[in-house]
UniProtKB/Swiss-Prot annotation:
Belongs to the bacterial ribosomal protein bS16 family. It holds the Pfam family Ribosomal_S16. One of its GO terms (biological process) is translation. Coiled coil: none annotated. PROSITE patterns: RIBOSOMAL_S16. This is Small ribosomal subunit protein bS16. The gene is rpsP. It comes from the Bacteria. PANTHER family: 30S RIBOSOMAL PROTEIN S16, SMALL RIBOSOMAL SUBUNIT PROTEIN BS16M. GO terms for cellular component: cytoplasm; small ribosomal subunit. HAMAP family: Ribosomal_bS16.
Length: 84
């Protein structure tokens, strides 16, 4: 089963996440099919906190990929951010 989830990057105590489409059996930070965005939870000032490729996410959800709970909330946040 294909899922849309977060893959952790960054340094110790400085997390940075890539939003990836991956096979659900793959390791958290392992092999992925496509990277569709990023999430920086500790962004400060003018740094970009969240970027998603909505068209690719819609495509993958249409093909049956299941987004994780956190990714669903990030998608909602991104759409809200786009409206402002």
């Amino acid at each position: 089963m294909v899922s849309i989830r977060l893959a952790r990057g960054g340094a110790k105590k400085r997390p940075f996440y890539h939003v990836v489409v991956a096979e659900s059996r793959s390791k958290r930070d392992g092999r992925y099919i496509e990277r569709v965005g990023f999430f920086n939870p500790i962004a400060r000032g003018q740094e970009e906190r969240l970027r998603l490729d909505e068209s690719r996410i819609a495509y993958w959800i249409g093909t049956g990929a299941k987004p994780s709970d956190r990714v669903v909330s990030l998608i909602k946040e991104f759409k809200k951010q786009q409206q402002v």
